[in-house]
């Protein structure tokens, strides 16, 4: 009994297996290209594993060629179906986000913004110019007020000087001077010439000293009064004369007052009295 040989494979089955292999290779190349061009995007899911009878392997193809088409049925005639990758989830990067504006619309917006900026700048410049003019007028007004103030100050100083001239205030008198009481002429006797001349004069006779005693008593009292008046005058003037000037002043006033003194009737004047002279023992001339 001879073994039966399997019929030759149908040419349509060979072409379908070759097409399936080409399709799988094309899918792998497409996936590799997408991975290189868009590394950030998620990888597409790999195709589901094919059943062993659909894998394009050489021994399987030979086995399939040896299978009777009546036994395999219409499954082999239909050919393998490869699942198509779902590309709906992948979005183009160009369409992501907002819609890009057109060039003409963007240029119009830029022109409008520049126009608004120029208007604001011109308004601000006009405002600053107005403020500068106001400051200039204010500075001129301040200068005029300062000049007027200086003129008024000079006028006030002149008025004060004239007021002081017209008032003529007199300084107050010291407390120890009273000008309300009348002051009469007080006779002042002449002072003695010197100590040497008085010591050399001898004692007059007993009758002569009794006559000039009233005159000497009268001369001592005016001398005290004159000294007190001189002290009052010096205190009122606020100054004191030197001792030499004061002695000369007292001597002159004493001589003038002595001339005015008139002795009683029947009594000789003090200037008319003559005293006997005696020569000194030392032999020097006397100085009167």
Swiss-Prot record:
Residues 128-159 are annotated as: Leucine-zipper. Belongs to the bZIP family. Putative transcription factor. The gene is kapC. Keywords: DNA-binding, Nucleus, Transcription, Transcription regulation. Residues 1-10, 42-54, 202-212 have a biased composition (Pro residues). Residues 84-93 have a biased composition (Polar residues). Pfam families: bZIP_1. This is Putative transcription factor kapC. One of its GO terms (molecular function) is transcription cis-regulatory region binding. It comes from Aspergillus clavatus (strain ATCC 1007 / CBS 513.65 / DSM 816 / NCTC 3887 / NRRL 1 / QM 1276 / 107). Residues 26-41, 106-116, 213-222 have a biased composition (Low complexity). It is found in: Nucleus. GO terms for cellular component: RNA polymerase II transcription regulator complex. The lineage of its organism: Eukaryota, Fungi, Dikarya, Ascomycota, Pezizomycotina. Its main location: nucleus. Residues 101-124 are annotated as: Basic motif. InterPro entries: AP-1-like, bZIP, bZIP_sf. The keyword Hydrolase does not apply. Residues 1-121, 172-226, 242-288 are annotated as: Disordered. Residues 100-163 form the bZIP domain.
């Amino acid at each position: 009994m001879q073994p039966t040989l399997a019929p030759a494979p149908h040419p349509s089955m060979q072409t379908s297996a070759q097409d399936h292999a080409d399709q799988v290779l094309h899918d792998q190349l497409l996936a590799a290209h997408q991975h290189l061009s868009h590394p950030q995007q998620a990888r597409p899911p790999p195709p589901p594993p094919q059943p062993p009878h659909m894998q394009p392997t050489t021994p399987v193809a030979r086995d399939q060629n040896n299978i009777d088409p009546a036994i395999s049925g219409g499954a082999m005639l239909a050919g393998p179906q490869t699942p198509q990758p779902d590309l709906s989830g992948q979005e183009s990067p160009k369409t992501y986000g907002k819609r890009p504006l057109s060039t003409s619309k963007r240029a119009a917006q830029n022109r409008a913004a520049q126009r608004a900026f120029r208007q604001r700048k011109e308004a601000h410049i006009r405002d600053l110019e107005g403020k500068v003019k106001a400051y200039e007028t204010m500075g001129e007004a301040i200068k005029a007020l300062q000049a007027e103030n200086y003129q008024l100050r000079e006028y006030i100083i002149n008025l004060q000087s004239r007021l002081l001239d017209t008032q003529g205030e007199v300084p107050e008198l010291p407390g120890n001077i009273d000008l309300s009481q009348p002051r009469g002429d007080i006779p002042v006797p002449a002072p003695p010439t010197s100590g040497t001349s008085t010591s050399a004069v001898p004692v007059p006779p007993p009758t002569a000293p009794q006559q000039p005693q009233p005159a000497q008593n009268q001369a001592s009292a005016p001398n005290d009064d004159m000294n007190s008046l001189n002290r009052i005058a010096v205190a009122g003037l606020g100054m004191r004369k030197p001792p030499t000037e004061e002695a000369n002043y007292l001597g002159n006033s004493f001589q003038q007052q002595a001339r005015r003194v008139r002795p009683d009737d029947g009594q000789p004047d003090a200037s008319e009295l003559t005293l006997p002279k005696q020569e000194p023992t030392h032999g020097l001339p006397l100085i009167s």
